[in-house]
């Protein structure tokens, strides 16, 4: 028996990202529970420390976007007879042949693979019958307010635009076809031609504004970049609609945070989305039609919380 019931291994902000925010909120909820646990930040503590921590617990829950780390921990936990719960924070089969094969290998030998949508569950259960689908969304415990200068910029943008949208990209990432996953340059092109509609781009890593400058891409004054660390929930709250124009996805944290705030969402239909989302095809024609016809409205607040299902899984194992 290990000293702890659970060893939680993952990355924490900064940098800000869907996985790191999920792990941070998971830890915050564990602090309120009666479960004995140990948290390891794999980026700061290192791989060696993370592997050593496995011996201290009965159940290991790993959060990583690296297919290589997923395979490494799957093999290691199998060899030392530890139960590995492994969350796949993206749509399965989104990589090329090698990485997809490695993902499937780790699914096969993990104790319980956890996926985020129905299409991934169909793939995972064919490989490992213990696979489960659990939402990555855990509601935020607080919203960190924006600084006064940023608030002023947003107010100015809203005063000049009839409708204000927001989108986010934690970094510049590309899909297996070489296209932008977040398709920010396509959004810029669209909003450059819609001066009456505003767009706030959450770019906490600063990588997108760097790319835009390097490529000398023009963006008009109805587009506002926020290229510093901030709470995207504060942006969602102050805009009319959130756009998720991605070429691939998992269980988007941003989509559910917008719905949790009662805000409408326009998103590509490349994965299963919550019922309240306006789903569009992944092309500019569909995006243009959705943005140009959008009228501000309130949606029923999203009430899902993935922590309760995860907690049950921890207790059962």
PLM features: what roles do these ranges have?
Residues 247:
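Aromatic "clamp/platform" in nucleotide-sugar-dependent glycosyltransferases that forms part
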Residues 264-268:
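Short hydrophobic beta-strand element within catalytic cores of glycosyltransferases
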